[in-house]
């Protein structure tokens, strides 16, 4: 009996050893039925782990850098007159320390050459109030820039330079080509140190409600963007323009990996209007709207109806003349369903041509009303003094 148990123990030991070796070296030989409770994972058969160019991004950078410029602006700053400067005795004791003669302030930014005849796209805030503009190209050439026009509500502007010889120009990507996760390069002149290329990814698209501009549809990126990068290029790995770097989120002024660029689809529309007429024309009806919250929907007994609540009507505006009232629910414009946010309403109305007559479909006192509204021209924003 003792011999039997000895043989059994030896056989069991050998069997377990064989199973251990097979499971270690050839786990696929074991039937999945012997591993109850273990989830089978499917590994990718694709051997390619990245679409990053084997030579890095130097080709894309070389393609783009000649078309990205440094912009230096200066503005005359008038100091308030000191009331004591007219007194000779005051000037005798204090000299010209309180001189109120004009001084000059300077600013810097970046821009993108969009055509071989010298048109440059940049941010409105880069050239705002500038009375002198100098543009420095990557090849060392410099030229005076003149403002063709600007659009404060999208923070875009176009300037022009005149130079002998060839002027490089950037290539545009197809509109709305950028996708979350795409690798991008940002090119500009951060802090005035000179042309700089940084790399990151597209973190998000269609960012709005940031309070930066009236019209917002930003590409968000973690590519380093710093003061001086404004107006520079955001490009894909092929060196095609996908956006104009415009702003960063930063409590201390440095890059925290949250930058915003105006997409090329928006930039092209604004740019073309500015080049043609020197300004941007948008539709306007004179209403303020707010989004309909679940509480408002219940209060107005809207059910599944989508739209925006008209909270204010400007007196004398096209909407006022047509009979639109505060408290109306706007659901459609010319039979086009509105999204449920104020940004979509703003985009819809601003895209209409002034003078066009459109039909507003309204819900008033739980009854559907159709009103014809003649679209007006959106007023330019007032400058802050």
Where are these regions (language model features)?
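Short alpha-helical segments in extracytoplasmic peptidoglycan/chitin-binding modules
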Residues: 330
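Conserved catalytic motifs of ABC-family nucleotide-binding domains
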Residues: 327
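Serine-dependent protease modules
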Residues: 2-306, 311-315, 322, 333-336, ...
């Amino acid at each position: 009996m003792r011999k039997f148990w000895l043989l059994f123990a030896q056989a069991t030991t050998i069997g377990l050893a064989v199973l251990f070796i097979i499971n270690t070296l050839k786990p696929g030989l074991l039937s999945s039925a012997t591993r109850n409770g273990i989830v089978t994972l499917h590994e990718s058969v694709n051997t390619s782990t990245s679409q990053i160019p084997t030579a890095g991004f130097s080709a894309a950078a070389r393609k783009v850098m000649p078309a990205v410029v440094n912009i230096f602006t200066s503005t005359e700053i008038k100091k308030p007159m000191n009331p004591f400067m007219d007194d000779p005795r005051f000037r005798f004791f204090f000299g010209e320390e309180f001189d109120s003669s004009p001084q000059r302030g300077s600013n810097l930014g970046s821009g993108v050459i969009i055509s071989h005849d010298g048109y440059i796209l940049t941010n409105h805030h880069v050239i705002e109030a500038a009375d002198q503009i100098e543009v420095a190209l990557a090849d060392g050439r410099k030229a005076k820039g003149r403002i063709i026009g600007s659009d404060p509500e999208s923070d875009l502007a176009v300037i022009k330079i005149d130079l002998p010889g060839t002027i490089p120009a950037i290539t545009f990507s197809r509109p709305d080509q950028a996708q979350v996760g795409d690798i991008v390069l940002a090119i500009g002149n951060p802090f005035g140190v000179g042309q700089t290329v940084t790399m990151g990814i597209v973190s998000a698209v269609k960012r709005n409600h940031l309070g930066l501009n009236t019209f917002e549809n930003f590409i968000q990126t973690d590519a380093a963007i710093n003061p001086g990068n404004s107006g520079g290029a955001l490009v894909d790995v092929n060196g095609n323009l996908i956006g104009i770097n415009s702003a960063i989120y930063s409590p201390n002024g440095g890059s925290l990996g949250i930058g915003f660029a105006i997409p090329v689809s928006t930039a092209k529309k604004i740019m073309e209007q500015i080049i043609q007429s020197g300004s941007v024309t948008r539709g306007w009806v004179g209403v303020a709207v707010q989004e309909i919250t679940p509480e408002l929907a219940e209060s107005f007994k809207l059910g599944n109806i989508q739209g925006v609540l008209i909270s204010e009507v400007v007196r004398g505006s096209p909407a006022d003349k047509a009979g639109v009232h505060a408290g109306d629910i706007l659901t459609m414009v010319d039979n086009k369903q509105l999204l449920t946010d104020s940004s979509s309403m703003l985009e819809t109305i601003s895209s209409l041509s002034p003078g066009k007559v459109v039909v507003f479909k309204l819900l008033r006192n739980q009854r559907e009303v159709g009103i014809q509204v003649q679209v007006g021209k959106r007023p330019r924003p007032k400058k802050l003094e």
